[in-house]
């Protein structure tokens, strides 16, 4: 009885394998006659991808890969003609085709009558991928239009990596660095949109290394590094950016100095900012950064002097106005705390009117101006609320609270 059961099981297995092989041939015929049926044919072919017999045969994956590329060829022509196509499926067919071909290559070995092992599909697979090399870029664009950003990035990854892949290197000529750099930049945008900041940072850095020196590349790289809380990367990228765009955007200096402050390497920070001030002595932002640095080092008087210099050079620098106003506010609070004790109410009122309130009002003026220039400075609003509360100025307190 056991022998009969085992025989039945063997016959069932063989029958299943034969059915899958027949299915593979059927799908091959259907794809040849109707490339547009590719999506449906892959659903039909799905069992062959997991069947122990057909899943280990190169033919199964080769047919799927060729079907994907033929579908792309047909549908991309339709797209050029202005016909309605599913851009997501169109772009994905290139990725799927490459994946299918990649599975076929290591399985492609045929033993001839003389016992020699040869390949049956590999030559055509390499040719197919090489001939469709530029289509990986086109596929990425189709996927981008369909807002399939991770998939678009994957297509661009193939476009940028295939020329250096030993399997395809002889058949594919790498594009110029300028095009490579632009595509790496686009990959960074795609990964940023997909919130993959680590990959985006690498993409932007690769683009810069390949000669993409537009300001956005540096700024987006810094933004990605910021999302990763990587101050060192922010500083390294800023150093390169400052060489090109430092005159128009001195925030780069701030990122470099912040990195030193975070590491408490104040001497290096001082040396860096002093060097740039020597080179550009009329740059208000440099004095602002110097002021913040001095404040971090506990050099309050130097901080105030540098912040004041920043405002004198640029009275529209909202951050400098805020920091300067805040330092005056701190001074008022310090005087009040250190000198305002052990007094009668009358003496304290006189003391406040002469020494504290004038400083609070002066600070308020700078803070108010900072908000006129940049209404997003929430810290300015917070300090102003405290000032007007201490001045018993209900009208201005209510106004600031309603901002």
Model-derived regions: residue spans:
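Conserved structural position within tetratricopeptide repeats
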Residues: 47-50, 106, 161, 206-209, ...
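Short coil turns that delineate tetratricopeptide repeat
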Residues: 53-55, 109, 164, 212, ...
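TPR alpha-solenoid repeat register
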Residues: 60, 168-172, 183, 216-218, ...
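Short coil/linker segments at helix-helix boundaries
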Residues: 67-150, 154, 158, 162-181, ...
């Amino acid at each position: 009885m056991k022998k009969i059961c085992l025989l039945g099981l063997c016959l069932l297995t063989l029958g299943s394998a034969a059915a899958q092989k027949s299915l593979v041939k059927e799908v091959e015929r259907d794809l040849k006659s109707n490339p547009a049926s590719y999506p449906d044919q892959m659903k039909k072919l799905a069992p062959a991808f997991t069947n122990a017999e057909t899943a280990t045969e190169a033919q199964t994956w080769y047919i799927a890969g060729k079907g994907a590329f033929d579908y792309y060829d047909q549908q991309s022509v339709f797209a050029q003609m202005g016909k309605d196509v599913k851009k997501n499926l169109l772009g994905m067919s290139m990725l799927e085709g490459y994946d299918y071909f990649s599975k076929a290559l290591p399985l492609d070995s045929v033993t001839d009558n003389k016992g020699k092992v040869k390949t049956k599909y590999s030559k055509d697979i390499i040719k197919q991928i090489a001939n469709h090399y530029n289509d990986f870029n086109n596929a990425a664009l189709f996927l981008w239009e369909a807002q399939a950003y991770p998939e678009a990035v994957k297509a661009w990854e193939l476009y940028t990596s295939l020329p250096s892949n030993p399997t395809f290197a002889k058949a594919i000529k790498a594009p110029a660095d300028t095009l490579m750099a632009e595509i790496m930049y686009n990959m960074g945008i795609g990964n940023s949109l997909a919130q993959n900041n680590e990959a985006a940072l690498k993409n932007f850095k690769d683009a810069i290394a390949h000669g993409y020196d537009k300001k956005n590349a540096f700024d987006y790289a810094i933004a990605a590094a910021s999302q990763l809380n990587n101050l060192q990367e922010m500083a390294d990228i800023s150093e390169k950016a400052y060489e090109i765009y430092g005159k128009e955007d001195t925030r780069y200096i701030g990122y470099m100095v912040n990195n030193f402050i975070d590491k408490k390497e104040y001497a290096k920070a001082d040396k860096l900012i002093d060097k740039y001030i020597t080179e550009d002595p009329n740059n208000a932002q440099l004095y602002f950064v110097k002021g913040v640095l001095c404040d971090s080092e506990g050099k309050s008087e130097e901080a105030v002097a540098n912040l004041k210099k920043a405002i004198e050079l640029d009275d529209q620098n909202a951050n400098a106005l805020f920091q300067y106003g805040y330092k005056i506010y701190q001074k008022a609070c310090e005087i009040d705390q250190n000198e305002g004790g052990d007094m009668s109410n009358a003496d304290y009122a006189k003391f406040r009117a002469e020494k504290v309130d004038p400083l609070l009002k002066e600070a308020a003026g700078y803070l108010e101006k900072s908000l006129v220039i940049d209404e997003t400075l929430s810290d300015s609003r917070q300090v102003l609320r405290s000032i007007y509360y201490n001045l018993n100025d209900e009208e201005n307190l209510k106004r600031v609270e309603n901002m």
